[in-house]
Swiss-Prot record:
GO terms for molecular function: protein-N-terminal-alanine acetyltransferase activity. InterPro entries: AcTrfase_RimI/Ard1 (IPR006464), Acyl_CoA_acyltransferase (IPR016181), GNAT_dom (IPR000182), RimI (IPR043690), YpeA/RimI_acetyltransf (IPR050680). This is [Ribosomal protein bS18]-alanine N-acetyltransferase. Residues 2-147 form the N-acetyltransferase domain. Signal peptide: none annotated. It catalyses: N-terminal L-alanyl-[ribosomal protein bS18] + acetyl-CoA = N-terminal N(alpha)-acetyl-L-alanyl-[ribosomal protein bS18] + CoA + H(+). It comes from Salmonella typhimurium (strain LT2 / SGSC1412 / ATCC 700720). Transmembrane segments: none annotated. Gene3D superfamilies: 3.40.630.30. The keyword Acyltransferase applies. Acetylates the N-terminal alanine of ribosomal protein bS18. Keywords: Acyltransferase, Cytoplasm, Transferase. Belongs to the acetyltransferase family. RimI subfamily. It is found in: Cytoplasm.
């Protein structure tokens, strides 16, 4: 059974392990552990009695920014990222958030397809934003109107 709940400080070491396993260029430890607090809505998804995914989202007034989402490679391709995002969007709507923003690597076709299927639209592009093994790649900034 899959459950979604708040990502607490006691969950951070397990989430940090997922961060390192799921991303080719993970956040620094300082950045990861620093994106917590009262302005954040950070969630975890548990599957098979194990943390399988997390989302780090900052909420400021009526806007939110999804800073980071990761699914453990052992749990990928099961729809858990979609499940976590749908839950996050529902929760943000109840809090009166009108727009959810995110950025995604231009090469991450699977994530872009997921975001588009949930109603996100491309807002702009940040050129040469993300590091790669060969240099840099663009970030696509996307927005989802949630409620008015």
């Amino acid at each position: 059974m899959n459950t979604i709940s708040i990502l607490s400080t006691t969950d951070l070491p397990a989430a940090w392990q997922i961060e390192q396993r799921a991303h080719a260029f993970p956040w620094s430890e300082k950045t990861f552990f620093g994106n917590q607090g009262e302005r954040y809505l950070n969630l975890k998804l548990t599957a098979d009695d194990r943390m399988a995914a997390f989302a780090i989202t900052q909420v400021v007034l009526d806007e939110a920014t999804l800073f980071n989402i990761a699914v453990d490679p052992d749990f990928q391709r099961r729809g858990l990222g979609r499940m976590l995002l749908e839950h996050l969007i529902d929760e943000l709507e109840t809090r009166g958030v009108v727009t959810l923003w995110l950025e995604v690597r231009a090469s991450n076709a699977a994530a872009i397809a997921l975001y588009e299927s949930l109603g996100f639209n491309e807002a702009t592009i940040r050129r040469n934003y993300y590091p790669t093994a060969q240099g840099h790649e663009d970030a696509i900034i996307m927005a989802l109107p949630i409620s008015m």
